[in-house]
Amino acid sequence: MKIIIFRVLTFFFVIFSVNVVAKEFTLDFSTAKTYVDSLNVIRSAIGTPLQTISSGGTSLLMIDSGTGDNLFAVDVRGIDPEEGRFNNLRLIVERNNLYVTGFVNRTNNVFYRFADFSHVTFPGTTAVTLSGDSSYTTLQRVAGISRTGMQINRHSLTTSYLDLMSHSGTSLTQSVARAMLRFVTVTAEALRFRQIQRGFRTTLDDLSGRSYVMTAEDVDLTLNWGRLSSVLPDYHGQDSVRVGRISFGSINAILGSVALILNCHHHASRVARMASDEFPSMCPADGRVRGITHNKILWDSSTLGAILMRRTISS
């Protein structure tokens, strides 16, 4: 009997240990290669390749519906690769939608979580709820900057790291908002979009201090992640894909821009905490919304509807 109990306890200990390891990742900013490799490890761990959108060993991935804890940690490394400093920042991310819920200062294990994630806890940390939410609307207002034109390089990430490590209290300050805008862009948004990954990664090997500048096109991608996620699974070789102002003319164009999409037909991906204009990257509220093929083009339904309406009015 004791042997049976021991084996059962050992089984659950192993399962628990695997789950703990599985929800901790490292994002290494030491070089462009280590950065991209780190992103790919996370994508592969949480996503499944779509065989219909694959070329030359590269695939579009869809987030698995998953089981167990919906959170994972991303430990930031390599911001100062020569000195090996600045390794105490951890971001806590929701698995099913890649929302960054807050950050952990690992020197004291305090978890500073955004107000809209006040229900979120993470093992081994003490939670402090910030006074502002995680929406881009709030972060840009408090930071006093727009994402369009925002510049990010190794120096600005170092400054952002130090701002987060020196923070205490519940106030969402300007420096924290700016820091989180930068880190969310080069973590969560880079996980979602190869276009953002590609734009930023080259700065890591550039000794001149050149910055990645977030373009209007980059921002447009981030604001349409939910719509893209709903439409792209229906791509089967159509001539092109249209979602709002976004247009892809081939599989390679899709893969060059998008890396990881939501599972829009799994209920957990469609749960919104705030108004849709605050979280425009969510899946459409109606999980049944799919892409529409018209004249050999795969359309987002609202984009096609708007165009057909304009044609009707003009005629």
From Swiss-Prot:
Q: What is the effect of changing residue 310 to E?
A: Reduced subunit association and cytotoxicity
The protein's Enzyme Commission number? 3.2.2.22
Q: Which SUPFAM superfamilies match?
A: Ribosome inactivating proteins (RIP)
In UniProt terms, what is the effect of altering residue 253 to D? Answer: 225-fold decrease in cytotoxicity, probably due to reduced translocation across the ER membrane
Stretches the record annotates as A2: 274-315
The Gene Ontology biological process annotation of the record reads: negative regulation of translation
Please provide the record's keywords in A-Z order.
Answer: Disulfide bond, Hydrolase, Protein synthesis inhibitor, Signal, Toxin, Virulence
Which residues does UniProt mark as catalytic? 189
> What's the effect of swapping residue 300 to K?
Reduced subunit association and cytotoxicity
UniProt-recorded Gene Ontology molecular function terms: rRNA N-glycosylase activity; toxin activity
Catalytic activity from the UniProt record: Endohydrolysis of the N-glycosidic bond at one specific adenosine on the 28S rRNA
Query: What cystine linkages occur within this chain?
Result: 264-283
Outcome following mutation: residue 255 to E: No effect on enzymatic activity or cytotoxicity
Region entry A1: which residue ranges? 23-273
In the UniProt record, does the keyword Hydrolase occur? yes
Assembly, in brief, is: Shiga toxin contains a single subunit A and five copies of subunit B.
Q: Briefly state the protein's biological role.
A: The A subunit is responsible for inhibiting protein synthesis through the catalytic inactivation of 60S ribosomal subunits. After endocytosis, the A subunit is cleaved by furin in two fragments, A1 and A2: A1 is the catalytically active fragment, and A2 is essential for holotoxin assembly with the B subunits.
**Name of protein:** Shiga toxin subunit A
Q: Which organism is it from?
A: Shigella dysenteriae
The gene from which this protein is expressed is stxA
